[in-house]
Amino acid sequence: MGKIIGIDLGTTNSCVALMEGNKPRVIENAEGDRTTPSVVAFTKEGETLVGQSAKRQAITNPQNTLYAIKRLIGRRFDEEVVQRDIKMVPYKIVKADNGDAWVEATGKKMAPPEVSANVLRKMKKTAEDYLGEEVEAAVITVPAYFNDSQRQATKDAGRIAGLEVKRIINEPTAAALAYGLDKKRGDQKIAVYDLGGGTFDVSIIEIAEVEGEHQFEVLSTNGDTFLGGEDFDKRIIDYIAEEFKKEQSIDLRGDPLAMQRLKDAAEKAKIELSSSQQTEVNLPYVTADASGPKHLNVRITRAKLESLVEDLINRTIGPCKTALQDAKLSASDIDEVILVGGQTRMPKVQEAAKEFFGKEPRKDVNPDEAVAVGAAIQAGVLGGEVKEVLLLDVTPLSLGIETLGGVMTKLIEKNTTIPTRKTQVFSTAEDNQTAVTVHVLQGEREQAVGNKSLGRFDLVGIPPAHRGMPQIEVTFDIDANGILNVSAKDKATGKEQSIVIKASSGLAEGEIERMVSDAEAHVEEDRKFRELVDLRNQGDNLIHATEKSMEELGDKLEANEKSEIEKTIGELKTAMKEDNKEVIEARIKDLTDASAKMAERLYTQQAEEPQPQKEEGKAAEEDVVDAEFEEVKEDKNKAS
């Protein structure tokens, strides 16, 4: 069995880790970074960029640069939070045929799992480059408060990326694993406060030694899947845009390019204000009007930022209270508070967590990496590398069915340990009813209409009888990923109907298979594209070097030799405009051979030219001094 990796698929950044022996290790990507921006861009040339390269070009290509896609995964287009998001992002959010929220870039409509699959593929490649072997399986994390549709959509993204998703694990639970694996201090109750780029979760977890096993039991979880660093950024963006409008009477919010620059600047300002008391946002030439170019310069203090986001921070406290109530604990029962997610670096957020739980949060857990590390530990458990660890997670929301009068009847209460199975007997509502519709719901409202509809199916062929007589046995079965299977059985006839819940929408099997095929085709396409780009760069460098050498040789170059090289350069330039790899390679070889002969001539002529001894000695001496200076500088850089 190959290595199972752990992936934190984040709203803003993603991270991959794996077990090395009995220690988890975070893997650096090709750029040398331990986290990768969860950004996917599509260029005019048809190239797909992922991570830092996608983020870098966002300013010039905002409509085709997709970020914070996790906020849309498994969601319906008509949901209020999606409608709010449409106003926040420069790319198009569109309604799919099945009512889901999809996105559009370069004229192509895509499902969020398809976009997220690009990020997962980059994580997979990062691990493969490190291991030197193919990776086929992963544990992927999701916010604890993700519903069934969102979990299923995340699993679909993994499959499209070419990964077998061995387990979907909740982010706070993963962070608790990262924190608690090497702690041997008896029983502990910890609160994991996870404020990331797009989501907020809080979980109350008990870590205990049970018969030699390290047991992690989630007592309760709560959260808000549309609250995170992106919302904090939006407040700063709006503030800066308003200040600029007051000063210049120009509203930047109608200009996608200016807004993308503003988004980058807001993110940087927010980060700076975690360690400084004030910062300046400087954006020269941000826009222009009839009077000329306009420059943006706005000073923001830490106090101003805190006042802008105060209500967002306060929104995290409600779920904390509910989580404690559900766990039947008070704040004083909590032994440790673990902060996870990049937004918890903000001092005011740390202060809010400290004030609520009444203790200083721990600083020895890396908020950006803890979730991926925990996923790697769970991967190690599944792969047999990590022994004596038992993880008992919970379902975040209650599950049930719609019954007479539009009521939701709960079969599985929220915070029930998973995997779990629950059966309940229902009956017909009318005389001689021969079929029942089982409408599966997730949520906490008494009214069925106020909850998330996960799907519905019919059980037919019930023998006619008085209402209340037939016995319909409904079974809910939640697997370890938190994904639901529902079955209904007529006890009299033994007839049974069942579904794996994939939401009332979600991706159909055929769509997933098409996306898997597309992804595989694109890997080959992208490889060929990259080869052509590399060849063109090689050709450009060769042309530049050859033309420079010709200039240096000047009239020392014979006319026929010069015209031959110019002809070869022209042929290479023509070849580089086409997409034929073999032809470009052949023309590069021709020019390499021609310029090698010219270089040989240049070298021979220089060697034959007599030079004054004094000057030569002086030059040599100067060269030595220069070389020494350069070398020392390089060594210093290496040391730092």
Curated annotation (Swiss-Prot):
Keywords: ATP-binding, Chaperone, Nucleotide-binding, Phosphoprotein, Stress response. GO terms for molecular function: ATP binding; ATP-dependent protein folding chaperone; unfolded protein binding. Induction: By stress conditions e.g. heat shock. Residues 603-640 are annotated as: Disordered. InterPro entries: ATPase_NBD, Chaperone_DnaK, Heat_shock_70_CS, HSP70_C_sf, HSP70_peptide-bd_sf, Hsp_70_fam. Residues 622-632 have a biased composition (Acidic residues). The modification Phosphothreonine is found at T199. The keyword ATP-binding applies. Pfam families: HSP70 (PF00012). Residues 611-621 have a biased composition (Basic and acidic residues). Belongs to the heat shock protein 70 family. HAMAP family: DnaK. Acts as a chaperone. This is Chaperone protein DnaK. It comes from Nitrosococcus oceani (strain ATCC 19707 / BCRC 17464 / JCM 30415 / NCIMB 11848 / C-107). The lineage of its organism: Bacteria, Pseudomonadati, Pseudomonadota, Gammaproteobacteria, Chromatiales.
